[in-house]
């Protein structure tokens, strides 16, 4: 998933809290930013099988 909101890549070492931005550079430390959205798939997802089953049934 791609998000327009980005977070400072170095926030854990540079800032005391996450710093969010819309651009490619952090507004406070001028460091790079990265996508803040979580990964859309996790192998440990306990309910993923059920969601996929519902989607398959809905598309049939």
Curated annotation (Swiss-Prot):
InterPro entries: H/ACA_rnp_Nop10, H/ACA_rnp_Nop10_sf, Nop10_arc-typ. GO terms for cellular component: ribonucleoprotein complex. The keyword rRNA processing applies. Keywords: Ribonucleoprotein, Ribosome biogenesis, rRNA processing. The keyword Ribonucleoprotein applies. Pfam families: Nop10p. It comes from the Archaea. GO terms for biological process: pseudouridine synthesis; rRNA processing. Residues 29-60 are annotated as: Disordered. One of its GO terms (molecular function) is snoRNA binding. Involved in ribosome biogenesis; more specifically in 18S rRNA pseudouridylation and in cleavage of pre-rRNA. Belongs to the NOP10 family. This is Ribosome biogenesis protein Nop10. The lineage of its organism: Archaea, Methanobacteriati, Methanobacteriota, Stenosarchaea group, Halobacteria. The gene is nop10.
């Amino acid at each position: 998933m791609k998000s327009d909101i980005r977070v400072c890549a170095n926030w854990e070492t540079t800032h005391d809290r996450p710093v969010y931005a819309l651009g490619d550079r952090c507004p406070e430390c001028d460091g790079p930013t990265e996508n803040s959205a979580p990964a859309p798939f996790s192998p440990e997802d306990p309910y993923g099988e059920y969601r996929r089953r519902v989607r398959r049934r809905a598309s049939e």
